Amino acid sequence: MPIGVPKVPFRSPGEEDASWVDVYNRLYRERLLFLGQEVDSEISNQLIGLMVYLSIENDTKDLYLFINSPGGWVIPGVAIYDTMQFVRPDVQTICMGLAASMGSFILAGGEITKRLAFPHARVMIHQPASSFYEAQTGEFILEAEELLKLRETLTRVYVQRTDKPLWVVSEDMERDVFMSATEAQAYGIVDLVAVVE
């Protein structure tokens, strides 16, 4: 039996009675954002809207983006990354579970020194993929050119965010490279690994 999104009580300032809101809406009020699915236009637009709204509401208080994502579409992922760089508050990124593909790109996009992975989290980088098998020859060539541009963009951002040499990142993006939390820290995708006490 599906339970849906859990509801929690929330009382707005000045109100006597609490109302029931879904848990994510309650957490958004604490500036806690979640990417817990494949990256697509819908979740990208939701996160961008929340980051912009919360940065207008208070431009000095950090935002926290929790990531557990298998990756997804490149352009919506880059839009999230660009918004993280654009908003005034620092965006802290936290990897819980998996940050693969665009998930790891967004994870690396957090404020440097404020990117964290849980101890058993996994991170994966690779090159962007395409749907070549669906394209005809002319479209195939145009799509290949666009894919090369996107790959170059992603590679340069990883180089900038990790301080790894271009040749290392380029070589690693040739295939799926999975990392533990400590390996992702050594690579420069995250700055800290959470410690369980």
UniProtKB/Swiss-Prot annotation:
Positions of the catalytic residues: S101 (nucleophile), H126
Alphabetized UniProt keyword annotations: Chloroplast, Hydrolase, Plastid, Protease, Serine protease
PROSITE patterns tied to this protein: CLP_PROTEASE_HIS, CLP_PROTEASE_SER
One GO CC term on file: endopeptidase Clp complex
Cellular localization per UniProt: Plastid, Chloroplast stroma
Keyword Lipoprotein among UniProt keywords: no
Highest taxon of source: Eukaryota
Annotated EC: 3.4.21.92
Matching InterPro entries: ClpP (IPR001907), ClpP/crotonase-like_dom_sf (IPR029045), ClpP/TepA (IPR023562), ClpP_His_AS (IPR033135), ClpP_Ser_AS (IPR018215)
One protein family per Pfam: CLP_protease
Enzyme class, UniProt record, top EC level: hydrolase
Chief place where the protein resides: plastid
Cited PANTHER family: ATP-DEPENDENT CLP PROTEASE PROTEOLYTIC SUBUNIT (PTHR10381), CHLOROPLASTIC ATP-DEPENDENT CLP PROTEASE PROTEOLYTIC SUBUNIT 1 (PTHR10381:SF15)
HAMAP family in the record: ClpP
Entry similarity comment: Belongs to the peptidase S14 family.
Summary of subunit composition and partner proteins: Component of the chloroplastic Clp protease core complex.
Name of this chain's protein: ATP-dependent Clp protease proteolytic subunit
Protein's organism: Daucus carota (Wild carrot)
